[in-house]
Amino acid sequence: MRSEQEMMDIFLDFALNDERIRLVTLEGSRTNRNIPPDNFQDYDISYFVTDVESFKENDQWLEIFGKRIMMQKPEDMELFPPELGNWFSYIILFEDGNKLDLTLIPIREAEDYFANNDGLVKVLLDKDSFINYKVTPNDRQYWIKRPTAREFDDCCNEFWMVSTYVVKGLARNEILFAIDHLNEIVRPNLLRMMAWHIASQKGYSFSMGKNYKFMKRYLSNKEWEELMSTYSVNGYQEMWKSLFTCYALFRKYSKAVSEGLAYKYPDYDEGITKYTEGIYCSVK
């Protein structure tokens, strides 16, 4: 596998020798000092160019970056409509395991880019001295934020209401429907509540990472095992068990948050739990 320095040299050398490229930035985890580096981090590179369309005429210019296993062009797909406006991106996995997420951005949109980026940006090349201020990468935008009373109640409401869809799916023997609601809505709100609880103890000055990937750092072995058990969805009994464990965990953490922030704890916890137990007893 080529080293980070080798890859960066390739990206910058290409940019230096192409007059269409005026500005180069690095984004994402490679700019975040709070994330330990590893070989699986993408190279999130943006080229700010004078003519995007000229690059799109063919893909031969991409060969300089290395031999690739696969390439995706998200803005050139029919099933998944593009979302980047005038931007155009390439996601490339190379044979040596390196991965590039390269975005072409019209140079005229650079000002908007810097005004609206997520903070994890490092300027690698600025041919025209466009940036006249210091750009320091930080992940502050992803720090856990103290919930308002309304946000706390919304999370509780969403968790308990959507859990009834899981119950309905299991009662109807529609396990894929149940699994989808557990995975996509119920558990994410459990994770949100757990993150709020942890931040209330540690301070609201850190990020849990994408998909709460750093949560294990803040849990005991027992707490982690309990959370992991909710991912067991291999059959109806396992699903019921996972759902009831989600209930117990959500109750534990949401009560802790409500007490710590002096927020009202919702009264529908008890009612939904009894409803679920009744349905479970009728179908098991």
Curated annotation (Swiss-Prot):
Gene disruption phenotype: Very slight reduction in streptomycin MIC.
pH dependence: Optimum pH is 8.0.
GO biological process: one example: cellular response to streptomycin
Disulfide bonds: none
Transmembrane spans: none
Zinc among keywords: no
Catalytic activity: streptomycin + ATP = 6-O-adenylylstreptomycin + diphosphate; streptomycin + GTP = 6-O-guanylylstreptomycin + diphosphate; streptidine + ATP = 6-O-adenylylstreptidine + diphosphate
EC number: 2.7.7.-
Gene3D superfamilies: Beta Polymerase, domain 2, Nucleotidyltransferases domain 2
Molecular function via GO: adenylyltransferase activity; protein homodimerization activity
The organism's place on the tree of life at top rank: Bacteria
EC main group: transferase
Biotechnological exploitation: Could be used as a selectable marker in B.subtilis if strongly expressed, could be used as a selectable marker in E.coli. Streptidine restores the antibiotic effectiveness of streptomycin in bacterial strains in which they both are co-administered together with a simultaneous overexpression of this enzyme.
Signal peptide (residue range): none
Location relative to the cell: Cytoplasm
InterPro entries: Aminoglycoside_adenylylTfrase (IPR007530), NT_sf (IPR043519)
Task of the protein: Mediates bacterial resistance to streptomycin. Adenylates streptomycin on the O-6 residue. Adenylates streptidine on the O-6 residue. Does not act on spectinomycin, neomycin-B or kanamycin. Specific for ATP and GTP nucleotides incorporating a purine ring. No reaction with CTP or UTP.
Assembly mode: Homodimer.
Note: Although this enzyme can be purified from B.subtilis, the bacteria is sensitive to streptomycin in vivo.
UniProt name for this protein: Aminoglycoside 6-adenylyltransferase
Species for this entry: Bacillus subtilis (strain 168)
